[in-house]
Structure formats: structure tokens, C-alpha cells
């Protein structure tokens, strides 16, 4: 029943926008058809398969000269290990107030639908305002996103779209090169009525010809977990001097328990293009404090302290490119290399093949298991029970 109501809402927005808004709606999006094979490790099945049909639909409508309405929806049909993994992620989701995406079961698949964005934007002469379910992003980091604490990233899934937050922001432009922004985000607990856990703050962006600087402060209201609230201080810098350099950091301060460097998440790296742009390389290091914004259990994904991400993209021609990437953890010497081959048959339609091989000391010489290995340890440090030795995805993507 909920799925039908959501479908009716989408139809109403798309069709009714012709009458509600002054301009024609602009509908765009992407569809992905993906087949997965996973060679299991530990207690996982030795071989498993799955199929996913995914669509991201985006609606943009102008009304007058200053206002824009945005909406985005994710539609998916799953079978096999895709559905099994979705159910597992839902059961393990760190936010107990967040329900996983509901699924409706068909003849040989399960279908899901979720609202991704729903907000408006007002463009003023000096002040811009956005409000609704939207992305409020911070920092210039390309991989780890230390400053981007409202929308945490995971480079193991580079194509994943960050979830939105319910909130608003107002941006003021004293001069063309300077932006001052105030923002507010609702608590993670949607049942909170007293403002506990609400996040509000300020950011500043200054741009020069070859460099940009962002400073950020955010305060999270006291709640039942953090009785004195949480302070966050961010600084992000990028510079284009032959190489493109980036420094992106966020310090999380809990007044009840000052944890020194453990509250710091800091990414630093560079990118560079060679051979007329045919070869692109990027490397970015992450220091992940144990109670920082990128740490597991504090909104992030990582259990150790020191990581390195590297990637190289080579374009054979206008239609075909190969991407080689890896994530390496210095603490337990585990790493996860993966390769992606993309071929564009015609404009807007491409085929892709991705393979990932989790590795650690246990795989190579019988040592200890690592976070990025086939069977990673549990978050509490205990021995893991299941994982994957090899993962391969074959897919087709259509953009419109």
C-alpha cells in the first residue's frame, strides 16, 4: 500500500507540475542494470549471484525567475544476493530510528522505492536559500570527505549517491569570491520533539584564482547520548598548482570527554592529468581518529587509523577507459584492489565491468584478518564469520 501511495505521489508531481509551475519540468536520471557474482569466504555461500535494476529519477522545475523545485527518487528491483545484502544492511543500520527501505515482493524479485531529494531553492541577488530534504555538503576532499559529516562517503562504493538530510541553508555573497552560509539539520531521531541532536552551524568559502579555502563550525544540540552537545570544527583547502592538492579535516569535540587526536579526521592528497588528459591519477591519505566523523560508530565507516586510496584512469579513446584503484590500511596491512572497464556504445549508454579482490595478511601468509580482507573482524574486534573472496559486477548504464 505504501509503495502505491508513493507511485501516486510521483505521478502527481510529474503531471501536476505542468499546472503548478510556470516552466516545463526537466526530468533526468540514470538507470543501471547490474549482475553480480560473489565468491564467498568464511560462513558465506561459496558462490552467490544477484541482479539489480536501479533507477534514479530527478525532477527540476523553475517557477518564475528566482525559485526552483527539486525532487529525486530511487527505484529498484532486486533478486539474489542483492536482496540478501539489502536486508542485512537494514538490520545492521547504525541509526535505530531509521527504517530500511521497504520492499514489495513480486513473482521473482523484490521492489523498493525511496525519496532521495525534495526541496526548493530561492536565488536572490545576495542571498540564496534552500530548504527540504537535500544534500548540505562540505569540504573539497574527493575520496574520504572528512568535512562532509552530514553525508559520509565510502570509496568502496564510488557510485553510491549520498543520502539527503532534512534541513535548510542560507548563503550570503558579500563579494563574488566569498560565500557565508548558515545551516540547520534535523536530529537523526525523527521522533525527537525537543531539538535534541539538532545540528546548526556556519561555514565560509573563499575562492582565489588557483586556490579555495573553507572553514566550518557546527554544534549538535545536547541529547540523551551527548549531554553537553558536540562541537565540530572543519577546515578544507584546495590548490591547483600543476598538481591539484587538497587538505580536508574535521575535529569533533565532545566536552564531556575530550579525546585529543582521536576526534580528528584528516584527508590529504593530490590529483594530476598526463598525456593530454588520457591518464588521470589521484591519491588521498586518511587519518581516522577513533571517535572522529569518519570512524565506525560515529557516522563513518572505518575502524582503523591510517588509510591510503589511489586510483589511475586511462582513456584508450573517446569511448573506452580503464580504472585501477585500491584502498590500503596501514594498521592491519589489508587492502582491496578493484578494476573497472567502461565502454560507451553511444552517447548516454555504456557497459561496465568491475572486479574487486579483498586481501589481507591471512590471505597472503596466514596472518591476522584485516578490515579490508575477505573476512573482516567484527566492529568489537572479535573474529569475523563471513565475507567475500572475490566480487565481480557486470552492468549497463543509461543516462537521460
Q: Which positions does each model-derived feature cover?
A:
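Transmembrane beta-strand segments of Gram-negative outer membrane beta-barrel proteins
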Residues: 22-40, 71, 178
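Transmembrane beta-strands of outer-membrane beta-barrel pores
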Residues: 33-39, 63, 75-79, 124-126, ...
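Repeated loop/turn-to-beta-strand initiation elements of outer-membrane beta-barrel proteins
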Residues: 25, 65-69, 126-129, 177-180, ...
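Outer membrane beta-barrel
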Residues: 60-180, 360
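Detector for outer-membrane/organellar transmembrane beta-barrel domains
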Residues: 208-210, 238-329
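Residues on the lipid-exposed face of transmembrane beta-strands in outer-membrane beta-barrel proteins
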Residues: 55-61, 117-122, 168-172, 202-206, ...
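Residues that define the transmembrane beta-barrel architecture of outer-membrane proteins
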Residues: 45-53, 111-116, 125, 162-166, ...
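Outer-membrane beta-barrel "beta-signal"
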Residues: 343, 353-357, 373-400
